Amino acid sequence: QTEHDPKKKTVLLYAHHDVQPVGDIDKWKTEPFTPQIIDGRLYGRGSGDNKAGVVTHYEVVKALKEDLPVNIKVFIEGEEEIGSPCMAEFLDEYQDDLEADVIVIADSGNIKIGTPTVTTSLRGLVDGVIVVEQPMRAVHSGLGGGVVPDAFMVLSKIIASFHNEKGELQIEGLTPSDMEVLELEEKDIKEIFGSKDINLFELDSISKRLWLEPALSILAIDAPSTDEAVNLLIPNAKAKVSLRLPPTENPEHAMKMLEEHIMKNIPWGAKVSFEPEAMGSGIVADPNKEFTKILVKNFEEVWENNAAYMGVGGSIPFANDFVEKFPNAELVLVGAADEEMGNAHAPNES
């Protein structure tokens, strides 16, 4: 941090240096940990999420170090991608050292290439594991098929209960957030998916569904691979489920609603349990506060383009820790990456 001047406001600059695993190496067109510039873009794991945030803060401080208009504190984390498990305890211990008037989290991004963007909301998150344990041993499908519901049948029915034929989430008791958002067009979201052929649900508003409403995804299923498949009825199966929450939804309430839905939709008297795991609140950042307005003005002058305000369908788990610990600080969510070609967490991140 810089030497403190009591006459100046204090800005805390946050980013994280840790990254996601590489994933399928065969889908990368460059070496993931060897930075490479192709057509003006930097490719490599962490190039956007979030080493770009670290470099952004470094360059800002370097450019202004001779005449800093504010006090600067820099906080670079190394556990964000595993949910920042030590963040709350760390903030408790170092609250006085990290106190600031403005907290700039450079872990978001831009809606389009060339459009400077401020993030005004983040969805919350709860997740957990559905566990099916039928009281039986594995039996040849020729001996038991059609007589008892095996674990895969049970799990499939529960998973199918989460959405209706229109793709609408069927978990009761969750309330969408109500706020004005930038309206995404169908072509925008197809660019993010990298396909013009992907079919979207019929929606009144893509942006509201993506940023302000709950959304459930099945992240993984424990099952034998098709290469190892044999004619057996399986007694045990698991599925990891992730429920994105509206920015203003209470995560404890949402976890309860998720579990209740699962328990109410157990078919055929099967033995099913739910193991809650991660839980985090969403965030709403007011774009009309002083620092954000100054930032947007400078964005537009430098980029020679109107700034955009967007929500983010994902979560930044630690952000709520900052909000709770520093309730009077202005929270600003920005980033160097973009939604069009960024590929955060995926192959060919740039």
Q: What label would you give each PLM region?
A:
Residues 20, 112-113, 169-228, 232-236, ...:
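An extended, acidic, His-containing surface patch that forms the Zn2+-binding/catalytic region
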Residues 89, 145-167:
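A short core secondary-structure module
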Residues 48, 136, 243-250, 280:
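A generic structural motif
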Residues 46-121:
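Acidic/histidine-rich catalytic neighborhood of metal-dependent amide-processing enzymes
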Residues 1-7:
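Short beta-strand-to-loop junctions in surface cap/lid or active-site-entrance loops
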Residues 8-73, 342-345:
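Active-site metal-coordination/substrate-binding segment of hydrolases
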Residues 17-19, 41, 75-84, 106-111, ...:
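Acidic, glycine-rich active-site loops and adjacent beta-strand->loop/helix elements
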